[in-house]
């Protein structure tokens, strides 16, 4: 099997998105070596990093915020390669992992000595569709994991300056950060989600980053939080709170590859409309609405309308 086939055949049952990426990187490294990597998941709507998976020994922990800021503030691939060259990186392979439903992440492999050969690049060329699908399906699987026991997510705020230095963290935000990216060593968690939305805000202010500075971050089980950055004079406030019904439904629809019409039907069903009311609202036949609902059940692997709505809402 070639590398893409090996990745497609990977048993993902029971794997978290982080464990999945670790397994995928292991298969890739067995065929194509690299000195460092960044394998990030992003919000499919905004493209902002939500879950980094990185081994970058050439970046000191204290320099991480500056590197993240420069990733968003560089307007071209050439400029980003200049940033990497300053870190001692001599060659890269970059993959944007996106489909018609959004941008799910990216993978960068870095080398600090010999460059990637044409043969190695050929081995990697077929990976983006496979990796894209795997990340999208990893998001979809989160909606089927029950919360046990259910825990309420407290809203919280992190204050940072323009250099991405944390100035204060509320207790609710601190607990949310622990769930987003638990530290592997004693000490506070790295506020990666905050760094990324703040970097996006700063780049947006400079006219470089096109989208709004917010993203949905997985907290474990079926829980999703929304993280937003907002300017407050010489500080930037990052708010963390439960994703709204609309935000969850959008992510649910993207992850399950729903069509625009199926997404409309889901939205109306989530707001309590029955089949007849949905048909009237969309000015379509009752039988057509039933067909859309059946397609929703099939695409989301739901056994009933109740289960479909519970998964989309997080119940």
Q: Where does each model-flagged region fall?
A:
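Recognition helix of helix-turn-helix DNA-binding domains
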Residues: 259, 272-307
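Short, basic, alpha-helical segments at the C-terminal edge of helix-turn-helix-like DNA-binding modules
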Residues: 305-315
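PAS-family sensory domains
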Residues: 153-215
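Regulatory input/activation interfaces that engage signals or partners
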Residues: 1-129, 133, 137, 211-213
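Regulatory hinge/linker segments at domain boundaries
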Residues: 146-150, 242-260
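PAS-family sensory/regulatory modules and their coupling/dimerization elements
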Residues: 196-245
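The N-cap/first-turn positions of alpha helices
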Residues: 261-265
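Short alpha-helical interdomain "coupling" segment at the junction between an upstream regulatory sensor module
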Residues: 135-151, 286
């Amino acid at each position: 099997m070639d590398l893409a086939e090996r990745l497609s055949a990977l048993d993902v049952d029971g794997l978290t998105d982080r464990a999945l990426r670790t397994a995928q990187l292991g298969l890739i490294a067995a065929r194509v070596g690299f000195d460092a990597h960044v394998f990030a998941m992003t919000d499919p709507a905004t493209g902002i990093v939500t879950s980094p998976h990185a081994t970058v020994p050439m970046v000191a922990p204290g320099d991480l915020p500056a590197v993240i800021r420069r990733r968003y503030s560089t307007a071209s691939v050439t400029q980003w390669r200049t940033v990497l060259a300053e870190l001692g990186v001599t060659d890269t392979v970059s993959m944007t992992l996106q489909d018609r439903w959004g941008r799910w992440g990216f993978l960068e492999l870095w080398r600090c000595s010999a460059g990637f050969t044409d043969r190695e690049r050929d081995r990697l060329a077929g990976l983006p569709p496979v990796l894209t699908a795997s990340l999208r399906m990893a998001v979809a699987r989160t909606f089927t994991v029950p919360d046990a026991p259910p825990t309420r997510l407290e809203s919280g705020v992190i204050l940072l300056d323009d250099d991405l230095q944390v100035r204060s963290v509320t207790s609710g935000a601190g607990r949310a950060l622990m769930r987003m990216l638990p530290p592997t060593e004693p000490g506070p968690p790295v506020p990666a989600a905050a760094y990324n939305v703040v970097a996006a805000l700063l780049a947006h202010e400079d006219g470089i980053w096109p989208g709004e500075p917010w993203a949905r971050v997985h907290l474990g089980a079926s829980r999703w939080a929304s993280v937003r950055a907002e300017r407050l004079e010489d500080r930037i406030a990052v708010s963390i709170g439960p994703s709204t019904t609309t935000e969850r439904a959008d992510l649910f629809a993207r992850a399950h590859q729903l069509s625009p019409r199926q997404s409309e039907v889901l939205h109306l069903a989530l707001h309590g409309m029955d089949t007849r009311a949905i048909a009237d609202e969309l000015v379509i036949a009752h039988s057509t609405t039933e067909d859309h609902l059946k397609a929703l059940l099939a695409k989301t692997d739901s056994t009933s309308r109740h289960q479909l709505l519970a998964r989309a809402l997080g119940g």
